Amino acid sequence: MTASSGTSVTPSVTWPPSLWAATAPPGPALPVLEGDETSDVAIVGAGFTGLSTAIHLREMGVAATVIEAAEPGWGASGRNNGQVIPTLAGHDPSAMVRRHGEAGERFNALLRDSASDLFDLARRFGIAAEAEQAGWVQPVHSPGRFKLAERRVKEWSAIGAPVELLDRAAVSAMLGSDVWFGGFWNRTGGHINPLAFARGLADVALKLGAAIYARSPAVSISRANDRWTVKTAHGSVTARALILATNAYTGEFEQQLAPDIAREVIPVLSWQMATKPISNNIAKTIIPDRQAVSDTHRELYFARWDARNRLVTGGAAMWPGAGGVNLREPVAERLKRLWPQIGDVEFDYVWSGYVGMTPDSLLHPEVPGFPRIHQLGPNGFAWIGCNGRAVALSISLGRELARTTQGAAIETLGLPLSEPRPQPFQSIVRKVAPFALPLYRRLDAKEI
C-alpha cells in the first residue's frame, strides 16, 4: 500500500442536526484522496461495515484502504437510533435455515453473537461510544402476539442465545408501562452512541494501519488486469479486492459505480428524535435498567435512553409526508400513551437518515427481508439490506467480508453469496413506499 498523500482543503461536511452529532467526540482528521494509490483491499464507505472490514483486514495483516464520500459515520451508521439488536426484523432462525440450509445455520450463529461482537470490540479497543450492554427487549403489542415471543425464545434458546420469555407483569416492571402483553429479552443487546462508535472505529482502523480518505466520493469502479480501480475526482485506489459497503446510500452512485446494486436496495427515510433531558424521578420509572426497546409493531415503536437522560425514539420510516415538524406531535403522543408518567414531551433533536431495505421487505411486509452479500466479480463484494437491523450485524459482516477477500471458502461464510437482483420497478417502489403505513397499521391491528 502506498503512503497516504491527500492534503487538499475542501469545504467541511454538513452533519445532520442530530443528538449524536452534538455529543459525539470529534472524529480523526482525514485527508482527501489525491493521486494514485495501491492497496490489497479497497473499501468504499466508512460506515460500520466498511470500518469493521478494514479493522479485521488489518488484524489479518492485510493492507486496507477506505474511501468515504463525506466523513466516517456520516450516513446511516451515524444517524440511527443506536440500538444493538442481535436478530433480524422479523425472521426467526428456522426461517433462515429454510431459505439457506447450512448457510442459514451459520448466519444464525453469526447473528446470535453479533451484539456481543460489537460490545467486545468496543471494550477491546476502548472506544468511547456510551456503550451499554443492558439487553434488548421486544415487547408484544397484542395478546395473540405473545406466541411470537414464545416461538422466538424457543428457537433462539435452541441455538444458545441468552434469551428469556417475559410475561405481562415482567414486561411492565422492566419497562415501566402496562401497555404491552409480554415479550422477550435478549441479554446481549443494548445501545450505543452510533456516531461516536463510527468515529471510534475509524480511529482504531487508523491505529492498526489502514488508510482512510474522507470527502472523496467515488465516481467510478472498473476492473482490469485482475485488479479493481476506484476513482475519485482527484485520485484512485487500485486493489486486488473490492468491498462496496454503502448499503442505503448506494443509490447515490446510480449507474456510475454498481448499477445492479443501486437498483436493488430501496433507501427508506427514517426519523429519529431525542427528548429534552428528563428528570431523574421520572426517568427511573421508564425502562429503569436502560435496555433497548423495540416492539412488534411494523409501524416501529422503539425507545432507548442516552447518557444524558434523553429518551431517543422516532417515527415510522414510512410516514406519509414525514418531516421533523409533522412527526413531533404524533410521536410525543405515542410516548405519553406508552409512559403517561412522562408528562409533556418536547424534542430537542429531530433528524433523519436512510435505511437500506430489500424489495421483499417492502413489497411483502408480512415477510421481512433478508440481508444479502453479493459478488460483483472476482474478489469484489457488496452487502445490502439491513432492513433496520444493521448496527450489530454490520460489525460481524465486516469480519465475514474481510474473510471473503482472503479466499475463505463459501461454505464457511456466515451469509451465502448471491447475485444482485436489480428491480425493474425500483423507482416506483421508492415512490410508493412512504404510503405503506396504512397497510402496516392494518397488519399491526390484526390479531394473530
Q: What is the role of each PLM region?
A:
Residues 1-41:
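Extreme N-terminal leader/targeting segments of oxidoreductases
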Residues 30, 128-138, 170-204, 208, ...:
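Helix-loop-beta segment of a Rossmann-like dinucleotide-binding subdomain
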Residues 39-66:
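N-terminal Rossmann-like FAD-binding beta1-loop-alpha1 element of flavoenzymes
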Residues 59-79:
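Glycine-rich FAD pyrophosphate-binding loop
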Residues 84, 124-132, 218-220, 235-378:
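Active-site substrate-recognition segment that forms the wall
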Residues 87-168:
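Dinucleotide-binding Rossmann-like beta1-alpha1 core, especially the glycine-rich loop
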Residues 147, 151-157, 179-240:
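Helical element adjacent to the flavin cofactor pocket in flavoenzyme catalytic cores
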Residues 321-445:
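C-terminal catalytic lobe of FAD-dependent flavoproteins
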